[in-house]
Amino acid sequence: MTSRGNHGSKTSSDKHLGDSDFVVVANRLPVDQVRLPDGTAIWKRSPGGLVTALEPLLRQRRGAWVGWPGVINDNVDLDLTIKSIVQDGLTLYPVRLNTHDVAEYYEGFSNATLWPLYHDVIVKPIYHCEWWERYVDVNRRFAETTSRTAAYGGTVWVQDYQLQLVPKMLRIMRPDLTIGFFLHIPFPPVELFMQIPWRTEIIEGLLGADLVGFHLTSGAQNFLFLSRHLLGANTSRGLVGVRSRFGEVQLKSHTVQVGAFPISIDSKEIDQATRDRNVRRRAREIRAELGNPRKILLGVDRLDYTKGIDVRLRAFAELLAEGRAKRDDTVLVQLATPSRERVESYKILRNDIERQVGHINGEYGEVGHPVVHYLHRPIPRDELIAFYVASDVMLVTPLRDGMNLVAKEYVACRNDLGGALVLSEFTGAAAELRQAYLVNPHDLEGVKDTIEAALNQLAEEARRRMRSLRRQVLAHDVDRWARSFLDALAEAPARDAT
């Protein structure tokens, strides 16, 4: 990634600027606060594909990361005073949030308004003016912290739906910066997006960037249409390609590029971890602990209503009832990571899923031999990889998902060319993983038929499918995703910095 050249002359206010040439802006910092037995608070690095992909660039280019550290802070004055956290050589700048910020900006507008709307209104979005006002206020704080962090002429990469207003705000504060934005969740169809009372403000916010990126070409096309419809902007009319043939929005002052950049995983690292003898041994132990069944079905998800956990449970129960899956030699393991536990719809979902699991085990299980094994807690990385290796069929059945990296992780783990991937058509991953067993999660009979086919696939068919899937996942990793976006951002049309 290279600089796009002269951004204009510096001003007398440059003494207030930061010294970071490359700044990542995300809702969360890549750290968690941990309390030691003596009560001391320390910061511990949290795992994640995004920081893994960007860490080399952050180190090479005097990089910094702006985000919320995950700690609710009602005692500190929420001014613009920046105190950095240095963790493993990375410089992190916290944006402090208080109880009201978390309730209204994060749990409210981000996750009870935008999240359900962008995921096809599986749950009805809630619109509150107070939530919107808090969203604007918190986005402004992120922009102000970033403005004070970035060096003159630097590059800023804003991440995801919680921060859609930051590009425009930052553009006004710092016209010298090169700004990119990437949306990690689906961008909705036009008719759904138009429901948002603040639809124009969101599109204007995103258009503060030089490059706006989505997982899929459909999201890019929807965004181009909305830019024409809501703002009267001139836009390109041709189809947007994947990492190519970018769309353009031509505004009075500048041109914004729009593209599709499917995100991925650190597939080579996962493939290597799978080969560890301890992971292999743990995979064998998992099968033994489950009673050495003939087939293990696996689901791995955040506990979220978009993930279709109830669909796979219902399909599995009916397969057992119809004798198409045998209760004495087939088990389903569902690993559900806790998520947004203070949001009401998530509380209801957890109760529903756990009731469903109990009903299936009560109907088809035996004492000491449940047919569904359900864990509602975070799973350590090596343990998760062992589950991937141990399982025979991976069930990825979201009703809507921007990409779904679990599907790619499973494929990266299967260097034995075993296993089968059942994958929802409504994930971004389905556009790339065409040799999976693709399924419509809204068609229960189709889900059942597909799971049955995956359970009974022949070994040669399994190898053929998995070999093709692995070629795709290993070649298109998270490093390629990040570099393709940042290369395109570096080549975007330059703006006048004045």
From Swiss-Prot:
GO terms for biological process: trehalose biosynthetic process. One of its GO terms (cellular component) is cytosol. D-glucose 6-phosphate binds at residues 28, 106, 160, 340. Belongs to the glycosyltransferase 20 family. SUPFAM superfamilies: UDP-Glycosyltransferase/glycogen phosphorylase (SSF53756). GO terms for molecular function: alpha,alpha-trehalose-phosphate synthase (GDP-forming) activity; alpha,alpha-trehalose-phosphate synthase (UDP-forming) activity; trehalose-phosphatase activity. Pathway: Glycan biosynthesis; trehalose biosynthesis. Its EC number is 2.4.1.15, 2.4.1.347. Keywords: Glycosyltransferase, Transferase. Homotetramer. It catalyses: ADP-alpha-D-glucose + D-glucose 6-phosphate = alpha,alpha-trehalose 6-phosphate + ADP + H(+); CDP-alpha-D-glucose + D-glucose 6-phosphate = alpha,alpha-trehalose 6-phosphate + CDP + H(+); GDP-alpha-D-glucose + D-glucose 6-phosphate = alpha,alpha-trehalose 6-phosphate + GDP + H(+); TDP-alpha-D-glucose + D-glucose 6-phosphate = 5-methyl-UDP + alpha,alpha-trehalose 6-phosphate + H(+). Pfam families: Glyco_transf_20. UDP-alpha-D-glucose binds at residues 48-49, 302, 307, 405-409. The keyword ATP-binding does not apply. This is Trehalose-6-phosphate synthase. The record marks 115, 185 as: Involved in alpha anomer selectivity. The keyword Ribosomal protein does not apply. Probably involved in the osmoprotection via the biosynthesis of trehalose and in the production of glycogen and alpha-glucan via the TreS-Pep2 branch involved in the biosynthesis of maltose-1-phosphate (M1P). Catalyzes the transfer of glucose from UDP-glucose (UDP-Glc) to D-glucose 6-phosphate (Glc-6-P) to form trehalose-6-phosphate. Probably also able to use ADP-Glc, CDP-Glc, GDP-Glc and TDP-Glc as glucosyl donors. CDD domains: GT20_TPS. It comes from the Bacteria.
